[in-house]
């Protein structure tokens, strides 16, 4: 479970261009929910997602993940917790174009502290690619894929470590409506397997397929 209490995020702190992106955001995300974070451009959606995913730190407030306070953790502990519990899907896919699908999805396992033989790692990679319908392309380089296929690979990489918490930043933003529908079906299946899924989106059709919506405007949660 995720608990956010009065989260404040300030960019360029102490400088002339100081900017407070989040103004006391409080929210609770229960295990197994599929949630959309919506709002206008610049409202603070991605900032909040980056805080949830340990990509960015907050300046005030409290973030508790599965009973563990995040704020006082050092970078090493945060990296370990992120690798074990959180899967992150970035807006630009963040895949290595010249790598094969298999080698891209393998990366989180190579950084994991879980002791696994190479065969077990490869089995996990194949299972993750199969879950998103990309197993048959595992030896193909990413640069040969369409946008929708790349998104599927990004999802496979995010779930290969078996995280309980999946975060996605505008995962359908560059996709057509048909591909968006296919990707949302993948997220739905992942959620039905018991994972918590949080999707930042500006697409109402995506938000409508989630169980709950958190709306952010001007750095605050609005009802």
Functional labels for PLM-detected ranges:
Residues 160-164:
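A short, proline-enriched helix->beta-strand linker immediately N-terminal to the Walker B motif
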Residues 120-132:
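ABC nucleotide-binding domain "signature" region
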Residues 141-145, 149:
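Conserved ABC ATPase signature
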Residues 99-108:
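Short coil-to-helix segment of the ABC ATPase nucleotide-binding domain corresponding to the Q-loop/switch region
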Residues 53:
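Helix-to-loop junction immediately C-terminal to a conserved catalytic motif
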Residues 166-169:
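Catalytic Walker B motif of ABC-type/P-loop ATPase nucleotide-binding domains
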């Amino acid at each position: 479970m995720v608990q956010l209490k009065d989260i404040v995020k300030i960019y360029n702190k102490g400088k002339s261009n100081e900017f407070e992106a989040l103004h006391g955001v409080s929210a609770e995300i229960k295990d197994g929910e599929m949630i959309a974070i919506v709002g206008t451009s610049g409202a603070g959606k991605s900032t909040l997602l980056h805080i949830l995913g340990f990509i960015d730190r907050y300046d005030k407030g409290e973030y508790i993940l599965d009973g563990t306070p995040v704020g006082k953790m050092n970078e090493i502990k945060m990296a370990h917790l992120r690798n074990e519990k959180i899967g992150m899907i970035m807006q630009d896919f963040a895949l290595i174009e010249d790598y094969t699908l298999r080698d891209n999805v393998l990366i989180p396992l190579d950084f994991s502290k879980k002791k696994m033989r190479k065969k077990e790692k490869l089995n996990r990679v194949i299972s993750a690619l199969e879950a998103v319908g990309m197993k048959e392309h595992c030896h193909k380089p990413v640069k040969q894929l369409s946008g929708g296929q790349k998104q599927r690979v990004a999802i496979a990489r995010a779930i290969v470590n078996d995280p309980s918490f999946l975060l996605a930043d505008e995962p359908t933003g560059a996709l057509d409506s048909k591909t968006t529908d296919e990707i949302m079906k993948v997220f739905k299946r992942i959620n039905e397997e018991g994972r918590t899924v949080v999707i930042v989106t500006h697409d109402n059709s995506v938000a409508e397929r989630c169980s709950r919506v958190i709306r952010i405007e001007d750095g605050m949660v609005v009802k």
